[in-house]
Amino acid sequence: LGDVYKRQIIISAIVHVVIGHLYPNEVYLYLAYAGLGTVLGHNFPCYLHFKGGKGIATTAGIIVGFLDPVIIVSCLIAFIVIVAITRYVSLGSITIVTMFCIEYAIFAFHGKYGFDLASAPSYHAMVESVIVVAVICGMAIVRHHANIVRLLHHEENKLGAKKAVS
């Protein structure tokens, strides 16, 4: 988990400093693509025969790397509240990636991330960044398919409970 955050924070710092200086209206587009690469590398590592994780910790690193305190705090609070109430970590995980996708799209379409919405190239970069973030979040949800099925059948393991024997 720590490696995910270190890697994503380094990538975010490089993108903010280098890309932000050269292309200030496209920083979040490049952050989204850097995040997508990180998630793809985590979910489908070639050295594990393309069988990796579900991408939640990596997506959490992306959320932190976007440096938006509103999104970071709201996702953290939602995760804590949902896990505390339901004791389902998977439900909390699915919730935060959904929240991140929705909040990012709303904030981006309202010009929060420096996109010049009056400029066609900047507007297109904003739309593209929203699509990339949606792909990242969609991958995390799809990779939780088995957890979603277990949640619907009330068979998902709860935090702190002994695992059910299958």
Residue ranges and their predicted role:
Residues 10-33, 64-71, 106-131:
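Helix-coil boundary and interhelical linker segments in multi-pass alpha-helical membrane proteins
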Residues 17-22, 33-41, 52-63:
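Short juxtamembrane and helix-loop transition motifs at transmembrane-helix boundaries
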Residues 31-36, 60, 72-77, 94-95, ...:
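Hydrophobic alpha-helical transmembrane segments
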Residues 39-50, 82-89:
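Transmembrane alpha-helix interface/packing and boundary motifs in multi-pass membrane proteins
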Residues 1-5:
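Short, small-residue-biased leader/transition segments that mark boundaries at the very start
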Residues 15-19, 56-86, 98-108:
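Interfacial segments of multi-pass membrane proteins
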Residues 52, 149-166:
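Cytosolic, membrane-interface loops and tails of multi-pass inner-membrane proteins
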